[in-house]
């Protein structure tokens, strides 16, 4: 069978009827039997995004990471020293076995969590389906893109994403944006096979009659036959041969920064602990194992799992709120925005545009204006927007009473069209009536219509467009705009040639016949939603292509500041510095092109803001791409949905507010884990360093450190489900390694102070009370003394680490002003009591622990309560100094 490139190259040189026959199809499309045969022969229309990981690879990646490698190295060293090099009868593989079991438990939890996350993401993705209009068995039908097969006939129009590599056999002013494949930013016109001027090209991408998967239809329409699907397409080939690089998000950058912070800290502390213990005790091998254990203790091994669980939980909650998170990280990015940019249509307004008035130039109702507007909207092949639909709907309604509006699609025949673009802000159709009179009918923004008109029509009389008439029209339209009505102008000219290739330059010397006034009222929820966003630290800015008067009227009704409004023309005259200042004070921007919208968003980002952009049209895709979070709706055009990070199933700002709050909850609970764990572990390591210098033995066995670390991490598994203070949700937050370092340096030494107090009490009071004597190096009772000491600090460390979670998880007074989730309470208590029970259970000899008496537990209660009180006091000083907590 020929390769895909050979088939594409052959298709542009082959008559259409021969290509149809080759793929066993016809102008009626494939039948179901042939669909299955072509699918078996040419494959499915899905691109392999790299080979899916096997279950074994997922298990491997869940278990093996830099931290577990260190653990396994410790296990290996312990195996060598305690088994292979041990004297006969003294072999003890306990430490190695415990470490391996702990690694497997940690990896198993992460593996299960990753599987749940993957499943949730897959289920959410299935909620958003891009479709294509396909002709099969002579009928047009909407099918998911992945159901297309080679030989299918597809209908394409403005706003569509090309669903496969296709060859055009019908086209009408069909322009495609294929910068993703070629790098060229300008739209390219594609022609039907029989109209292509030259097929002698160096690259298939230059072929005028070929369009490729993943490119976007900017304007016009076409009918095409699918030539290649899935991995066989140009896009599929690129996916298979290139490792695409996505620029890391701010979240990913800060996670990397935190990781390097921990690595640097570990590189400093581990050698110090190693030399301190080696010089004190003289056992360098044991000192090495202990130092490596310290390194493990300093790192939050469960961080990847906590992050995944938090993001997945947020995504699942948002799905219940009719918000689909396409990328897990987007939920956190959504919580970090402090500016939401959005078009007003369908967001502030009800998205149900009604044509209120078809008016002549003096503002009187005129069905002749509606007649011409209908011709323009009905016969255009581009994307019919809400106003086109409103025109068609009003015409169908009025045609029952007005003969002038009846049978227009039979009276008129379309000759040509000039599609809409965002520079001209208008579109034209050329039609011929049953008297063979050829006319151009143009509809567009009134200001643009006035620039191309030389005459006006009033009650059948055509007169020159004078300055007085122009001002009268503008005054009338201004009045309508102030009422919140959107206005389009309608013009025409007749007596044109049929056999002529019309161009944009022919939109001249037009006769302005009237205008159309549309009503798109604000949503009742718009004003409270904007206020709710503001209360959560998110300012709403309107970026619209509509004119300033309509925009002003709508924005005033929903409570937005319209005193300072910027227009697209103003922005073009501004330097970057001037725009940087303007975007801070201006709330409403009108008459913008897509490029101007993107420029505003980029400037806001340069100013240090987290920016979300919400849109649903072709012109919104560039803005969504440059924003920190691109937001769209399930009814948006394909390219908008493809570009978006977040898709709303309900186009309502109230839903977004919920998403932003949920994103901040995700951030809060991840931050809790990182700050708590890093500061707690730092305190433990500082305590170990002090103990290593002053104690004649290890304050805790390596296996104790590892068990302590894992049990603590398991208790933190509940943190993604913790409650978050309402005050914290009022403002956006960003990741800062500096903030984490500061928190660690402040809170870590506090735990060290109480650890050192514990050392003193254990060494001089509690352990001597139990053993009846003080520590004497080399004596028969020395081992018992060491085991009791290590047990005492082991239990105290667990209680201090788990109980302080409740102090650190909130800036408020815990349990009184801020209550943790019941699962957090349960997990911390289970962890603390589990470790406390170990000296009294079956693992006592394996872990080398020993029971402690009542004096120890009285001391433990006092030291833990004193520690919690001290943390609460220091917390108030910290918040007062730095104006933050988490």
What are these regions (language model features)?
Residues 527-529, 535, 547-558, 595-603, ...:
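Acidic, divalent-metal-coordinating active-site segment for phosphoryl/phosphodiester hydrolysis
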Residues 64-84, 100-110, 129-130, 260-278, ...:
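Alpha-helical transmembrane segments of multi-pass membrane proteins
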Residues 95-129, 136, 246-339, 516, ...:
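Hydrophobic alpha-helical transmembrane segments
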Residues 1-140, 146-149, 154-162, 167-247, ...:
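Non-lumenal N-terminal regulatory segments of integral membrane proteins
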Residues 210-218, 333-511, 518, 531, ...:
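Cytosolic catalytic regions of ATP/NTP-dependent phosphoryl-transfer enzymes
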Residues 73-98, 261-299, 312-322, 498-501, ...:
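Helix-interface capping motifs at the ends of transmembrane segments in multi-pass membrane proteins
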Residues 273, 277, 304, 311-313, ...:
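Membrane-embedded transport module
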Residues 44-76, 118, 140, 201-210, ...:
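Soluble-to-membrane junctions at the N-terminal ends of transmembrane alpha-helices
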């Amino acid at each position: 069978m020929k390769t895909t490139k050979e088939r594409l190259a052959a298709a542009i040189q082959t008559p259409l009827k021969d290509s149809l026959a080759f793929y066993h199809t016809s102008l009626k499309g494939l039948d179901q039997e042939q669909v299955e045969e072509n699918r078996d022969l040419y494959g499915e229309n899905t691109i392999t995004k790299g080979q899916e990981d096997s279950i074994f690879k997922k298990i491997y990646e869940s278990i093996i990471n830099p931290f577990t490698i260190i653990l396994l190295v410790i296990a290996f060293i312990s195996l060598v020293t305690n088994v292979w090099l041990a004297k006969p009868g003294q072999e003890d593989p306990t430490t190695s076995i415990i470490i391996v079991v702990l690694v497997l438990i940690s990896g198993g939890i992460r593996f299960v969590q990753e599987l749940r996350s993957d499943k949730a993401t897959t289920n959410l993705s299935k909620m958003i389906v891009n479709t294509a209009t396909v002709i099969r068995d002579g009928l047009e039908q909407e099918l998911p893109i992945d159901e297309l097969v080679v030989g299918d006939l597809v209908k394409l129009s403005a706003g569509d994403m090309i669903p496969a590599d296709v060859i055009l056999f019908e086209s009408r002013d069909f322009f495609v944006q294929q910068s993703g494949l070629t790098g060229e930013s300008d739209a390219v016109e594609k022609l039907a096979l029989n109209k292509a001027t030259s097929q002698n090209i160096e690259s298939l991408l230059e072929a005028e009659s070929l369009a490729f998967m993943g490119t976007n239809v900017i304007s016009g329409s076409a009918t095409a036959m699918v030539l290649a699907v899935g991995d066989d397409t140009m896009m599929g080939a690129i996916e298979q041969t290139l490792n695409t690089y996505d620029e890391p998000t701010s979240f990913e950058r800060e996670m990397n920064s935190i990781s390097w912070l921990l690595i640097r800290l570990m590189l400093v502390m581990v050698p110090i602990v190693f030399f301190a213990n080696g010089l004190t005790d003289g056992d360098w091998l044991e000192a090495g194992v202990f130092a490596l254990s310290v390194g493990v203790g300093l790192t939050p091994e469960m961080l990847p799992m906590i992050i995944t669980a938090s993001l997945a939980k947020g995504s699942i909650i948002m799905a219940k709120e009719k918000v689909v998170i396409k990328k897990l990280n987007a939920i956190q990015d959504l919580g970090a925005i402090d500016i939401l940019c959005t078009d007003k249509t369908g967001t502030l307004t009800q998205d149900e545009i009604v044509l209120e008035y078809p008016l002549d130039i003096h503002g009187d109702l005129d069905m002749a204006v509606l007649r011409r507007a209908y011709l323009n909207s009905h016969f255009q092949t581009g994307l019919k927007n809400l106003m086109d639909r409103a025109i068609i709907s009003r015409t169908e309604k009025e045609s029952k009473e007005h003969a002038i509006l009846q049978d227009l699609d039979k009276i008129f025949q379309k000759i040509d069209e000039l599609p809409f673009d965002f520079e001209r802000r208008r579109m034209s159709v050329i039609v011929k009536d049953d008297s063979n009179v050829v006319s151009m009918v143009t509809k567009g923004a009134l200001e643009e219509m006035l620039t191309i008109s030389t005459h006006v029509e009033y009650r059948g009389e055509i007169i020159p467009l004078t300055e007085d008439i122009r001002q009268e029209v503008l005054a009338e339209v201004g009045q309508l705009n102030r009422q919140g009505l959107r206005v389009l102008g309608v013009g025409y000219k007749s007596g044109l040639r049929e056999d002529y290739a019309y161009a944009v330059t022919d939109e001249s010397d037009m006769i302005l016949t009237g205008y159309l006034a549309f009503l798109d009222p604000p949503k009742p929820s718009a004003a409270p939603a904007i206020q709710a966003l503001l209360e959560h630290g998110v300012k709403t800015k309107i970026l619209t292509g509509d004119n300033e008067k309509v925009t002003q009227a709508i924005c005033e009704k929903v409570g937005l500041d319209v005193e300072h409004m910027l227009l697209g023309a103003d922005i073009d005259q501004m330097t970057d510095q001037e725009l940087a200042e303007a975007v801070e004070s201006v709330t409403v921007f009108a008459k913008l092109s897509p490029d101007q919208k993107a420029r505003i968003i980029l400037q806001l980002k340069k100013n240090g803001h987290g920016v979300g952009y919400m849109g649903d049209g072709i012109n919104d895709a560039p803005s969504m791409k440059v924003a920190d979070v691109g937001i769209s709706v399930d009814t948006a055009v394909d390219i908008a949905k493809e570009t978006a990070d977040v898709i709303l199933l309900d186009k309502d700002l109230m839903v977004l507010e919920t998403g932003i709050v949920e994103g901040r909850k995700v951030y809060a609970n991840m931050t809790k884990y990182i700050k708590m764990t890093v500061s707690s572990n730092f305190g433990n390591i500082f305590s170990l360093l002090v103990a290593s210098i002053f104690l004649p033995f290890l304050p805790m066995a390596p296996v104790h450190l590892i068990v302590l670390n894992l049990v603590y991490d398991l208790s933190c598994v509940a943190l993604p489900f913790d409650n978050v203070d309402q005050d914290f949700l009022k403002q956006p937050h960003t990741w800062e390694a500096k903030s984490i370092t500061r928190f660690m340096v402040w809170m870590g030494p506090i735990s060290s102070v109480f650890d050192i107090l514990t050392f003193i009490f254990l060494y001089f009071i509690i352990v001597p009370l139990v053993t009846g004597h003080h520590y004497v190096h080399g004596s028969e009772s020395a081992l018992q003394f060491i085991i009791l000491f290590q047990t005492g600090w082991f239990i105290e460390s667990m209680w201090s680490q788990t109980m302080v979670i409740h102090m650190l998880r909130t800036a408020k007074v815990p349990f009184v002003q801020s209550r943790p989730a019941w699962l957090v309470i349960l997990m911390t208590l289970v962890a603390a009591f589990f470790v406390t029970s170990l000296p009294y259970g079956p693992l006592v000899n394996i872990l080398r622990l020993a029971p402690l008496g009542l004096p120890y537990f009285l001391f433990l209660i006092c030291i833990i309560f004193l520690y919690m009180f001290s943390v609460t006091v220091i917390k108030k000083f910290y918040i007062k100094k730095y104006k933050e907590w988490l």
